[in-house]
Amino acid sequence: MPPTPLQSEPANLDGVRDLRRPLADWLTSKDNRLFSRNIVNRVWGYFMGTGLVEPIDDLRATNPASVPELLNALSEDFANNGFDQRRLMRNIMTSRVYQLDSSALPKNATDTRLYLHYNVKRLPAEVLLDGIDDAAGTQERFAGVPLGTRAISLPDSNFASYFLDTTGRPQRVIACECERTSTPNLAAVLHLLNGDVVQRKLTDKNNRIAGFITNKTSVEDAIR
């Protein structure tokens, strides 16, 4: 029996030496809406805090999208334009729904699925650490990579960092988005308040604060 992709015809592998090629061709076929819907839902979820389908990687027939017409339209545009992720992100970020105020009205304060207001979300662990470095003008040091390598550029979770582990970095032992956690916890709060990572960046003699003091920068200019 020849291998048959989901919702597709049996694959003709005569003369094929690298089986990854027909797999890639099927994944990126315009007729394969499984791929485009999955990517669109995942990118939408990253920007909006919740996916059109939740959980993000549970796209089964019995778990419909909150706004199926929107998922279909974005998926079709994504597939018809060469799976251009920049275009997809631009479409999302220039939309009215992405630019909604996060302040909710009493009648829609609990909504997280219909996007009646922007859903406030916590920064992922890697983005949070990089953001602290950007604000402080410091560089994080990870063993085995050059100084200044950003947390979002680390190839895997084997680079030791108590900060990243405490604030929700996944260990990447299962293929599920659910492994990453954004749930607040006491350890993360205490580490941000008085942990050694933030303390080290605040006391770094070459940080942005030291530069402001040396240059006698006014508060207004420092904020600006």
Regions found by a protein language model. Give the residues of each.
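Short, glycine-/Ser/Thr-/acidic-enriched flexible segments
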Residues: 157-159, 196-197
